[in-house]
Amino acid sequence: MADEAKAKGNAAFSAGRFEEAAGHFSDAIALAPANHVLYSNRSAALASIHRYSDALADAEKTVELKPDWAKGYSRLGAAHLGLGDAASAAAAYEKGLALDPSNEGLKAGLADAKKAAAAPPRRAPSGGADAIGQMFQGPELWTKIASDPATRAYLDQPDFMQMLREVQRNPSSLNTYLSDPRMMQVLSLMLNIKIQTPQDSDFSQSSSPSQPPPQQQKQQPETKAREMEPEPQPEPMEVSDEEKERKERKAAALKEKEAGNASYKKKDFETAIQHYTKALELDDEDISYLTNRAAVYIEMGKYDECIEDCDKAVERGRELRADFKMVARALTRKGTALAKLAKNSKDYDIAIETFQKALTEHRNPDTLKRLNEAEKAKKDLEQQEYYDPKLADEEREKGNEMFKQQKYPEAIKHYNEAIRRNPKDARVYSNRAACYTKLGAMPEGLKDAEKCIELDPTFTKGYTRKGAVQFFMKEYEKAMETYQAGLKYDPNNQELLDGIRRCVEQINKANRGDISQEDLQEKQSKAMQDPEIQNILTDPIMRQVLMDFQENPRAAQDHLKDPGVAQKIQKLINAGIVQTR
């Protein structure tokens, strides 16, 4: 059923799983291809993962199916704005406002579009991965690659050209390609420093003639200043007695609301209730009076009355086609009241469902925070009901027996159950980390070892587990730091001392260049993802220091007298970027 797929999409969207949400909406569209709401929802999901071109196509389909629906133009504007077309975005928001002039979402979108159109191009930050990635912008990149004999042949390799274009589109994606020696060589060329890379790479063997660098066209949006001619002032309109009375009642209702707000701030809740009730009697076309009164009921602990007011606000808001933010606010207040009641009823499901509905109306941080709190409360409640240290110890012993028999997957199952029964036992995380290490699941092993240390910092097994994982991952400096941290609690621990000795041997071996080219490349690739390494390589002073090391050894020795420079050089040596011979 299309409704079922839509509900799954809404739930995934509320949880921030936008790719999954788009898939569910696609399933729903296959069942109901004429439903404009489904295209609108999928457009929002696609925009959330920056697939703006696809989001634009869905938004255009939404408007085509339902041209008198204001939210469709909101989706259209958001997609245009994501693609950098501020003018088209503004036009879309204006069309939506023509249908619903009071829509706050469209007003905010139009303001953002106008601001984007007027703003000068933003410069990227100068540090980190983005700063290095920015070096790949502009035609000088192609000139340098074409003029260097070592890199010229890369221009004839389609896969490498695709990587370069991806880095130009998204500078932060550079880390993804640093394991490719060609990219490391081009990075070395752009930084104007010599980075140690594997020699005689197969990628550089090509006799194909170099191609001229492609000319990149920089497209700049044209902006036209329009001078608005003053519109003639209309003649005063005659107002009927009925219309005049309606305006007076609305004005009186707003005064009652302001008085209610003042009483609420003073925590005079009974008086606030009276003012909001009077405002409702004067004007039943503004659901904020209901949501405000609901907020007072929450403070008074009258959760059933709060829920009743919120339900009325949602129903009346639908009838009036009120701003979806107001409807979302009513649902959030209802969810808050339900979460309060759940502390006694121990049923958080309906509160969670209500928060999810609120997020489909309008996604805002407060509602998302309350949803996360309700989900955590539900999880904690389930954990409390399942807690049993005695059964946890029994499962841990079963896991230990399976570990001795080298049945590691079975051991993990028992450790999992032990953790569910008692999540505060550091020993179980240590044992499970050992299983993961035996199975080669290093990230999981590292996570368990860190959890073990978090639960009991004095338990040295946690440090030996973590150090072992880092050693197997060839992160010898980090492993040594872990072993040293464990020695603070047990200075004579032989396992920790042996771990430090092994790390020192590997570090010295790497510093002498006594490792394979494959290991060197892997070490450099990991190092280039370290923000500290990235900042060192983009520091103009350090780049000059590295050039002096290659061209002026005497000046390089002077640089090493600066403790800060010496520390950074040692960091590059440890990372394999610089080698000593």
Curated annotation (Swiss-Prot):
GO terms for molecular function: Hsp90 protein binding; preprotein binding. A motif (Bipartite nuclear localization signal) lies at residues 250-267. TPR repeats lie at residues 2-35, 37-69, 70-103, 253-286, 288-320, 332-365, 392-425, 427-459, 460-493. GO terms for biological process: chaperone-mediated protein complex assembly. SMART domains: STI1 (SM00727), TPR (SM00028). Keywords: Acetylation, Chaperone, Cytoplasm, Nucleus, Phosphoprotein, Repeat, Stress response, TPR repeat. Residues 199-209 have a biased composition (Low complexity). Residues 148-187, 530-569 form the STI1 domain. Residues 199-261 are annotated as: Disordered. It comes from Triticum aestivum (Wheat). Its main location: cytoplasm. The tetratricopeptide repeat (TPR) domain, forming a carboxylate clamp (CC), mediates interaction with the highly conserved 'EEVD' motif at the C-terminal ends of HSP90 and HSP70. Residues 243-261 have a biased composition (Basic and acidic residues). Phosphorylated. Acetylated. It comes from the Eukaryota. The keyword Repeat applies. Mediates the association of the molecular chaperones HSP70 and HSP90. Mediates nuclear encoded chloroplast preproteins binding to HSP90 prior to chloroplastic sorting. Pfam families: STI1-HOP_DP, TPR_11, TPR_16, TPR_2, TPR_8. One of its GO terms (cellular component) is nucleus. Co-chaperone that forms a complex with HSP70 and HSP90 and preproteins (e.g. chloroplast preproteins). This is Hsp70-Hsp90 organizing protein. It is found in: Cytoplasm; Nucleus.
